[in-house]
């Protein structure tokens, strides 16, 4: 398997969510997304410039430059509204911005030592194509850190609780705060439909990105992979 299921027009959807995105994510994750972002930053380690893919409102890039004050970052997202949100809230941040799909990065080969992709993998219609593009722009020996919302294993004691949370709480909170119940129903479905670890890691290998570290967070409700070119 190299492609995920067909996606709706999520570019328009994420543009519409930009004003309330951080607030809703904070509520839905009980604030844990901050710790998860920091865990990704810690596992990536320090470099002078980070390529942050599917950057959204820039929370990972902000965490990165706060942890490594000498660093800067290039933020890539296909949602103009998301990137405008970062620029308005953090005008002095050491960021440059590119509005682009990850499958067609307007960047030269072998440029970046570190790249990140948080909560973006499950939104890709063509993950193998996107990961091959990331491989192209990474330096030899460079690393990509992926943080994604995942499902606990079926034998995990929290599996049923997590399923109920996705089915009942996530769409309700999203509808209440954003007025967009469809978007948060999509969030539920994108987590449910994300392939399990073995299938994902087969895609990583097909893109010539070798998993060198994996960390499960909160009983497997989120997962970090560090991949090496």
Swiss-Prot record:
GO biological process: menaquinone biosynthetic process; methylation
InterPro entries (UniProt xref): SAM-dependent_MTases_sf, UbiE/COQ5_MeTrFase, UbiE/COQ5_MeTrFase_CS
Family annotation (Gene3D superfamilies): Vaccinia Virus protein VP39 (3.40.50.150)
Catalytic reactions on record: a 2-demethylmenaquinol + S-adenosyl-L-methionine = a menaquinol + S-adenosyl-L-homocysteine + H(+)
Entries under PROSITE patterns matching the protein: SAM_MT_UBIE, UBIE_1, UBIE_2
An example Gene Ontology molecular-function term: demethylmenaquinone methyltransferase activity
Residue sites binding S-adenosyl-L-methionine per the record: 57, 77, 101-102
SUPFAM superfamilies: S-adenosyl-L-methionine-dependent methyltransferases (SSF53335)
Keyword Transcription: no
EC number assigned by the record: 2.1.1.163
Domain of life, per lineage: Bacteria
Keyword Phosphoprotein: no
Family that this chain belongs to: Belongs to the class I-like SAM-binding methyltransferase superfamily. MenG/UbiE family.
Pathway, per record: Quinol/quinone metabolism; menaquinone biosynthesis; menaquinol from 1,4-dihydroxy-2-naphthoate: step 2/2
Annotated Pfam families: Ubie_methyltran (PF01209)
Catalytic class of the enzyme: transferase
Protein purpose: Methyltransferase required for the conversion of demethylmenaquinol (DMKH2) to menaquinol (MKH2).
Keyword terms of this UniProt record: Menaquinone biosynthesis, Methyltransferase, S-adenosyl-L-methionine, Transferase
NCBIfam families xref list: MenG_MenH_UbiE, PRK00216.1-5
Lineage, highest ranks first: Bacteria, Pseudomonadati, Chlamydiota, Chlamydiia, Chlamydiales
Protein name: Demethylmenaquinone methyltransferase
């Amino acid at each position: 398997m190299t492609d995920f299921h067909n996606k709706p027009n999520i570019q328009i959807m994420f543009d519409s969510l930009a004003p309330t995105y951080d607030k809703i994510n904070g509520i839905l994750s009980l604030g844990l997304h901050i710790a998860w972002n920091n865990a990704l930053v810690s596992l990536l380690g320090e470099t002078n410039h980070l390529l942050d893919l599917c950057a959204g409102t820039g929370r990972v890039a902000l965490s990165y430059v706060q942890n490594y004050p000498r660093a800067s970052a290039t933020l890539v997202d296909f949602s103009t509204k998301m990137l405008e949100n970062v620029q308005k809230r953090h005008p002095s941040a050491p960021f440059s911005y590119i509005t682009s799909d990850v499958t067609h990065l307007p960047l030269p080969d072998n440029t970046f030592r570190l790249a990140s992709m948080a909560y973006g993998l499950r939104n890709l219609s063509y993950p193998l194509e996107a990961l091959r593009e990331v491989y192209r722009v990474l330096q030899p020996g460079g690393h990509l850190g992926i943080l994604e919302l995942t499902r606990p294993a079926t034998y995990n004691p929290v599996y049923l609780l997590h399923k109920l949370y996705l089915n009942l709480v996530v769409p309700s909170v999203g509808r209440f705060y954003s007025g967009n119940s469809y978007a948060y129903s999509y969030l539920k479905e994108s987590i449910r439909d994300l392939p399990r670890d073995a299938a994902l890691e087969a895609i990583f290998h097909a893109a010539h990105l070798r998993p060198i570290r994996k960390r499960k967070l909160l009983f497997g409700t989120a997962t970090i992979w560090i991949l090496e070119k």
